[in-house]
Amino acid sequence: MQIKKTKLAIIAGGGDLVLSTIKSCNRQNISFFLIGIKDHYNNQIHPPDINLSLNNIGNIFSILKNEKILNIVFIGSIKKPYLTKLRPNFLTIYYILLIMLYYFKGDDKLLTKIYNIFLRKGFKVLDVRKLLKSNIANNKYNNLKNFKNKITLKEISYYFNLAKKNGSFDKGQAVIVDGNKVLLSEDRKGTDNLIYRYKLLDRIDNFSLLVKTSKPNQNMYFDLPTLGPTTIENVYLSGIRGIIIEKNNSLIVDPHDTFKLIKKYNLFYYAI
């Protein structure tokens, strides 16, 4: 990987994939500078080199310049704040004005605008999958053979397309399905909240599934669909019977533990 010769900036929000990215850099002897987004970055094992508030996010370009960094990667979750709750400095206000037209048009348009700002500043945004190859979802653990009396390949494909169609409205990456229809859709509160809302319904469904895919127009440098042990635990406790996920475009947190739990709880899993 070409970045081995230069320092990499990891711009990190919350979630366990941040630590996976750090470990990958260490294994490959990639020098990195970790920028944690305040109130989102939550890794206690590896404190960030700098903790940057969204109120001062406009300072990020001078920070990168001072560190002589050109290559950057985004990893982890950052909830889009309500603008009325921000107290930005003057430089951040300038960048907010640049993205204002896109702020309320959905995450995809907003993230692409942010991506283009970094490019125009001379930075190269890298695909985090290059660092997390062992975390990319594949079909190695597909277990359809154990559930052939419950679901068919045709139904799997249909549910996958339902999730993609839902994602085309830029409202979320995940849906819960059963009986050839969408029962609930993800909103800005995320996948675990979607599962919680399903649990509150106390439904008795035939074979409800969580389906998670990238959105059709998604910028793949940000916010890839993610599945990990916490979500698997929540799926099981909610009564959902399994997961369909998009292979190659999704990331698995702690694959060993994740698939161990899927097997333990006898959950359906299919990467399509």
Where are these regions (language model features)?
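Ser/Thr/Gly-rich flexible loops in soluble cytosolic domains mediating phosphotransfer, phosphorylation
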Residues: 88-130
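Short glycine-rich anion-binding loops that position phosphate/pyrophosphate groups of nucleotides
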Residues: 77-80, 215-216
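Conserved mixed alpha/beta catalytic, RNA-binding, or beta-rich assembly cores of soluble enzyme
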Residues: 15-18, 25, 51-54, 104-108, ...
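General beta-strand structural signal in soluble alpha/beta enzymes
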Residues: 10-12, 34-36, 72-75, 125-130, ...
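Selective hydrophobic functional segments
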Residues: 70-73, 83
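Short acidic, glycine/serine/threonine-rich loops at helix termini
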Residues: 21, 44-46, 84-87, 137-140, ...
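N-terminal basic/disordered segments at the start of proteins
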Residues: 3-37
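Feature captures the catalytic cores and cofactor-binding loops of soluble hydro-lyases/lyases
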Residues: 37-69, 86-99, 193-272
